[in-house]
Curated annotation (Swiss-Prot):
Family indicated by similarity: Belongs to the SurE nucleotidase family.
HAMAP family cross-referenced by the UniProt entry: SurE (MF_00060)
Keyword terms: Cytoplasm, Hydrolase, Metal-binding, Nucleotide-binding
Name recorded for this polypeptide: 5'-nucleotidase SurE
Cofactors, names only: a divalent metal cation
Gene label: surE
Chain's role: Nucleotidase that shows phosphatase activity on nucleoside 5'-monophosphates.
């Protein structure tokens, strides 16, 4: 079995190294990941300049490249360089990736990119203190997240993903144990409410930060409710076809019916 591992925290993150360690007994592990932190890069591709790549030593990996691109670039590079894979894993991410806003996440978007190439994929994230989400995972225990990653990966490699499922989005609570219950969930609606905060530099010129508040009320059955309220491991099956499952004739009537 050939497994691709990537992330958005960068190839030097302890999270990706924990993932490689967990998966190395299940197959040949290839790593391609950004050289630097690329959180919240979504499914961006680098089209305006060349991409540089360098070999990096990652214990347990057959080969590992760090690239000066995005998580999506990493998946494209890996497929072009090494051919097809049996599975792609993105993570273990520093901080949860929940709700319909997974499209902002470089972690989830790398898994989505792999899925568009018909490679079954898993995005996995570990809930951590927000102050640690942009570091390299210093002092963070990835053992429980690694346990669930290995468990889920083994099942996918043995049985495949269910029909209609292209990827899994997995979120592990910070206080999880190997005995923590797993919930199969749907994506919550928008979780983060961003806005612009204006500040002024010493020369009197304005500059801006994107800031906002997280919602803390969630519907039962969603990934956010499972993680934040029930403290369960959330596994959300994702289909990359974002077509609304509605009656097309009803849409036609609403949009094009004669007055």
């Amino acid at each position: 079995m050939r497994i691709l591992v990537t992330n958005d925290d960068g190839i030097y993150s302890n999270g990706i190294r924990a993932a490689v360690k967990a998966l190395s007994s299940l197959g040949e592990v290839y790593v391609v990941a950004p050289l630097f932190q690329r959180s919240a890069s979504g499914r961006a591709m680098t089209l305006h300049r060349p991409i540089r790549a360098r070999l990096v030593d990652v214990p347990g990996a057959k080969v590992a490249y760090g690239i000066d691109g995005t998580p999506t670039d990493s998946v494209i590079f890996a497929l072009a360089r090494f051919g097809d894979f049996d599975l792609a894993v993105s993570g273990i991410n520093l901080g949860e990736n929940l709700s319909t806003e997974i499209t902002v996440s470089g972690t989830a978007s790398a898994a989505i990119e792999a899925a568009t190439h018909e490679v079954p994929s898993i995005a996995i994230s570990l809930e951590v203190d927000w102050k640690k989400t942009l570091g390299e995972g210093e002092g963070i225990d990835f053992s429980v997240a690694s346990h669930f990653l290995k468990r889920i990966t083994r099942a996918v490699l043995e049985k495949g993903l269910p029909e209609g499922v292209d990827m899994l989005n997995v979120n592990v609570p910070s206080n999880a144990t190997p005995e923590t219950e797993i919930a199969i969930t749907r994506l919550a609606r928008k979780r983060y409410c961003p806005t612009i905060e204006e500040r002024v530099d010493p020369r009197g010129h304005p500059y801006y930060w994107i800031v906002g508040q997280k919602r803390e009320e969630f519907e039962p059955g969603t990934d956010a409710y499972a993680l934040k309220i029930e403290r369960k491991v959330s596994v959300t099956p994702i289909n990359i076809d974002m077509t609304a499952r509605v009656n097309f004739e009803e849409v036609r009537k609403v949009l094009f019916a004669q007055p």
